[in-house]
Design a protein with these regions (language model features):
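Structural microenvironment flanking redox-active thiols in thiol-disulfide oxidoreductases
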Residues: 60-97, 107-113
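Thiol/disulfide oxidoreductase modules built on the thioredoxin-like
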Residues: 94-99, 106-156
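Short, ordered coil/turn segments that flank beta-strands lining enzyme active or ligand-binding pockets
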Residues: 29-31, 128
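N-terminal targeting signals for export/organelle localization
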Residues: 1-27, 156
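Short active-site neighborhood of thiol/selenol oxidoreductases, capturing the structured segment around
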Residues: 36-60, 66
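Hydrophobic beta-strand anchors of alpha/beta hydrolase catalytic cores
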Residues: 48-49, 77, 123
């Protein structure tokens, strides 16, 4: 009976390797101009797409790791601001600093769902061919940060 207590209760499906990211359109966070995914994914071997919100406490916890990844300069960071109030999101970035190269808005959550996200925060490591290499459900922590760096170092 007690063995069942050790099993995780949250179901997170495993990511199948080499799934290609589909093209999408979104609004650029700061300007509200429409932007195509082809414009986001240029001139980098790797991209980290991070889905976040100002109201998400674990998003605050992972923020220092996003800043560290920005400083590594081996990956382009793309933020997707999920179901958020723009004023609160701007305050979040102002307070904690902006690690992202680009941010797009996802006010109703459809873009995040299309990408295969189940909540916030979630992150996708994507290669230059727009293939998803790694999916991180939940906040980036030391373990997932180290795994991302390991993947980036294997190819550089």
């Amino acid at each position: 009976f007690f063995k069942g207590l050790d099993k995780p209760t949250i179901y997170t499906p495993e990511l199948k390797k080499n799934i290609s990211l589909t093209n999408f359109e979104a609004k650029e966070f700061f300007s509200d101009q429409k932007i195509n995914s082809n414009e986001l994914f240029t001139k980098s071997n790797f991209y980290l797409v991070n889905i976040w919100s100002s109201w998400c406490v674990p998003c605050r916890d992972e923020h220092p790791f996003l800043l560290k990844l920005q400083n590594e300069n081996k990956v382009k960071l793309i933020g997707i601001n999920y179901k958020d109030n723009k004023k609160n999101a701007l305050k979040f970035i102002e307070e904690l600093s902006n690690p992202f190269d680009k941010i797009v808005s996802d006010k109703n959550g459809t873009l995040s769902i299309k990408l295969g996200a189940y909540g916030v925060p979630e992150s996708f490591l994507i290669d230059q061919d727009k293939k998803i290499v790694k999916k991180i459900v939940g906040p980036i922590d030391q373990k997932s940060y180290s795994k991302i760096i390991e993947i980036l170092n294997e190819t550089n």
